[in-house]
Amino acid sequence: MNVSKWIGTGIALHAALVAGAAAAPSVALDIGHFLEKPGATSARGREEFSFNRELALEIERALKQHGLRTQLIGADGAQIRLGARATQGRGADFFLSVHHDSVQPHFLQTWEHAGEARNFSDRYAGFSLFVSRRNPAPGASLACASALGEALRRAGFQPSLYHADPIAGESKPFADRANGVHYYDNLVVLKSAASPAVLFEAGVIVNRDEELVLGQAGTRERIAVAVAAGLGGCLDAKGTKRER
């Protein structure tokens, strides 16, 4: 056996694998909110940040299985300004901010859960996706948002659509109604991102039934697999080279 040739081949193969991994598209996963200001409160009193972190970690696993590189932002729950979140994701090829949804205050009702009065609204359910036309890559942002929405619908999830309602606090026009994509031009994390960017509202946690579904590990896995499929396909379609 030619040992030198074998070693040389091994080194070359390792270098090729390293180069392939480095060429894989990267996704910055922004975990919405932080411990001191955890976002919306669910119908049963759970803070949005905990939903966001659990789902983002599941999405990270799915993206890695799909061959993508990832960067988590905000996983430790420390406060990060909105503009700084976008700055932290500047090295990535795509920026995805993970959230869970509520409703406008006038839609909230009160019920008792575990001996405490809690706000809820069963009026709306479903996911929403947002893009900004002030992002430096609005076309790519919309293309990937549409791909995400389509993949989520194929997985059995439905868009909420209510963010387009002509009421105070909403009126976010559709960018792609069928796939639940809205324009939200002034959203800081979207317009400040250096790469194509989407904000993903996975579901409405003030809806009592949807909260229970979103809290299930199986649901998180289904969402994550759909997100990885949609985003992976979008990045491929953009011509980004990725090791398969």
Please describe what each predicted stretch is.
Residues T9-G10, A22, L35, S42, ...:
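Generic hydrophobic-segment detector
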Residues A15, A40, F107-Q109:
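Alpha-helical transmembrane segments and their juxtamembrane interfaces
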Residues P25-G45:
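Short glycine-rich His-centered loop
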Residues A19-P25:
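Boundary at the C-terminal end of the N-terminal hydrophobic targeting segment
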Residues G8-V18:
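Bacterial N-terminal signal peptides
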Residues S50-R244:
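Active-site-proximal helix/loop segments of hydrolytic enzymes
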Residues M1-K5:
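Positively charged n-region of N-terminal signal peptides that target proteins for export
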